[in-house]
């Protein structure tokens, strides 16, 4: 279940599981969000077909912001994923701030366990999953995990 946002506008810290239908109902409340969710659904279908079982969603899409720029996502790296399929779907291309992903899906995808060095106010090496669990001020926030088996 997706918890209510805190007064800061962010989810409470933690990893909050949700089904796709709940996620869609919770966040689909403006035309821009609807557009982004359609792109996310297309990307998730590709990820699921490539063998990915879950993704983590973070960033401003999880806040009350009516028109977020994109949806920030990360997924678990696994050796048995269908790498050619992921590449063909632009889900491995992080060049130019994930330009191909943003153009095709309105989303950014990274490996959850990939390290980021000294990113923003967080002066340490952290993973994308850890990064998504901090706001721009470095304070803890929540993320949503979607099981891809819950897609309709």
Region locations from a protein language model:
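Acidic active-site catalytic centers that drive phospho-/nucleotidyl reactions
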Residues: 70-72
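Short hydrophobic/aromatic beta-strand micro-patches
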Residues: 74-76
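Catalytic core of pol beta-like nucleotidyltransferases
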Residues: 1-54, 62-68, 78-152
